Amino acid sequence: MSRHSTSSVTETTAKNMLWGSELNQEKQTCTFRGQGEKKDSCKLLLSTICLGEKAKEEVNRVEVLSQEGRKPPITIATLKASVLPMVTVSGIELSPPVTFRLRTGSGPVFLSGLECYETSDLTWEDDEEEEEEEEEEDEDEDADISLEEIPVKQVKRVAPQKQMSIAKKKKVEKEEDETVVRPSPQDKSPWKKEKSTPRAKKPVTKK
């Protein structure tokens, strides 16, 4: 099995959490600041802004305030119950702190999205190699077990002397078959039989 030098690989993964807030006449602003020690790497992915079921028939405008008020507010949704009660927002990533404000209307307006935290995991290539080696060892063990379970059938071999005697016997039987000559139909004809039998000579009388 091949060995490789140890080296570290940093992988960046994202951990997402649901986020939501409400804007109404009593609470016209809300600020997202992130949570925990990872708030510096946090992003807010806004998804939907919608009116509540108790919203009045009036225009409700939601805007985002810039940090420290350096830039003018940006309107992200203008809602009305009978016309547009909900909007779907996509592709907006906001870095905390982010402040939302209900500029006009009494709401209630609900905002929802995802808190996205980036985390760095330090993984080692050796750990992956060890896992691969363990898998290969398991496969080898399974193959050995399967070979042990297969029954081995023993084949009986005939002794050389016995083989020679059998071959000799077959040869003798073949020679005997060749020596036996069967009479042909011509040998059975009466003419040939009479010709083959010699006639008796008549005695000659001396004068």
Curated annotation (Swiss-Prot):
Residues 198-207 have a biased composition (Basic residues). Coiled coil: none annotated. Residues 1-20, 121-207 are annotated as: Disordered. One of its GO terms (cellular component) is chromatin. It holds the Pfam family Nucleoplasmin. The record marks 57, 84 as: Interaction between pentamers. Keywords: Chaperone, Chromatin regulator, Developmental protein, Fertilization, Nucleus. GO terms for molecular function: ATP-dependent protein-DNA complex displacement activity; chromatin binding; enzyme binding; identical protein binding. It comes from the Eukaryota. A motif (Bipartite nuclear localization signal) lies at residues 165-180. Residues 129-152 are annotated as: Acidic tract A2. The keyword Plastid does not apply. Residues 123-147 have a biased composition (Acidic residues). One of its GO terms (biological process) is single fertilization. The keyword Nucleus applies. Residues 1-15 have a biased composition (Polar residues). Ovary specific. It is found in: Nucleus. PANTHER family: NUCLEOPLASMIN, NUCLEOPLASMIN-2. Belongs to the nucleoplasmin family. The acidic tract A2 mediates histone binding. Core histones chaperone involved in chromatin reprogramming, specially during fertilization and early embryonic development. Probably involved in sperm DNA decondensation during fertilization. Homopentamer, when bound to H2A-H2B dimers only. Homodecamer of two stacked pentamers, when bound to H2A-H2B dimers and H3-H4 tetramers simultaneously. This is Nucleoplasmin-2. It comes from Mus musculus (Mouse).
